[in-house]
Amino acid sequence: MEIKKTSLNKLHQDNKAKFVEFAGYEMPIQYSSGIIEEHKFTRSNSGIFDVSHMGQLFIYGDDNLTNDLEKIFPLDLKNLKLNSSKYSFLMNDKAGVYDDLIITKLEEGFLIILNAACKDNDFKILSNLLKDKYKMVLDDQRSLIAIQGPKSVEILNLILKTVADLNFMSGNWFTYKGQKLYVTRSGYTGEDGFEVSISNDLVELFTKELLENGAKLIGLGARDTLRLEAGLCLYGHELGTETTPIEANLKWAISKERLNNGGFIGSKNIISQIKDGAKKIRVGIKPEGRLIAREKTKIYNESEQIIGEVTSGTFGPSVNGPIAMGFVDQEFSKKETKILLEVRGKKYPANICGLPFYKKSYVKGANWWVM
């Protein structure tokens, strides 16, 4: 199957990007300065991420659509304000996660941002669940870029006046070169920032303006280290069809009203796990010393019994040390619990810790993922 390219592919090439294949797309993993420098630049300035491989699903409908979506997602969509966004999940009957997503309420319906590897399957699942009653468009004519970091608001505001007025997890339509684009104040780096949905034919020009104003292109490598420092889940690592939001320590993302009344797909198992406790739970892990524990590293208790597994691990440039997330048996999930990590046949000491590893907020409400 032919590898797809985003509308910014030539710009990536011109900026000497190193590419990898991801979810069927040729995507920039890093540029010439390298992942660590790109990571640090985003934390101190403003980084531009091409995330056009992700799905932008527009579903058009009225109050009936809202009612039908509440049977699917564990959200209080009836009371979601216009242009407000929520983090949520598409789940199976056992509350395993098909995908984690961001859903935004628009005047004519909803915009749902889906993970690249999941978007086609998500579309099929939602089409079946909604029984084709509503117009659904998985829009490949629009690109998606994320502008992240403390200087992003000032840079973007030079191009889109009043974008600084947006609250965290809210959005609005703006006009650029005579065309409409949709901007939300959101992101997945632990920094203040924005995501911009813009037509494919304008995205390169728009991105060049951001670059001229001081932002830099950042690859997916730094996006991963940034999200891990922020303690954020990555689908296929911390989330999947065998893992529930409760096990992933994401109870906060389920509306309280829905927890009380249920009525959404997977609600029976969600409510049961809250009542009885999940057997395994996602935790932060801080290895002692400089050892990096990668995905699938086995986790042991001090008696050297296996109690879990690492799902993501890296060197955290902002904390200047190794960090990891993983799942452990509930009884070993308390902060400061001492554990062992098996790397290349040897066991090394580490500690369970809280999340995020790195905490910084520039806009009210931005630390929505803190555990």
Model-derived segments and their meaning:
Residues 50, 100, 195:
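Acidic active-site catalytic centers that drive phospho-/nucleotidyl reactions
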Residues 93, 98, 113-117:
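Short coil/turn segments at secondary-structure boundaries
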Residues 1-23, 27-31, 105-371:
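Conserved, structured C-terminal
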Residues 98-101, 352:
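Short beta-strand and beta-hairpin "edge-sheet" elements
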Residues 1-90, 96, 220-221:
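Acidic, proline/glycine-enriched N-terminal capping motif
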Residues 53-60, 89-91, 108-110, 141-147:
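Conserved short loop/turn motifs at secondary-structure junctions
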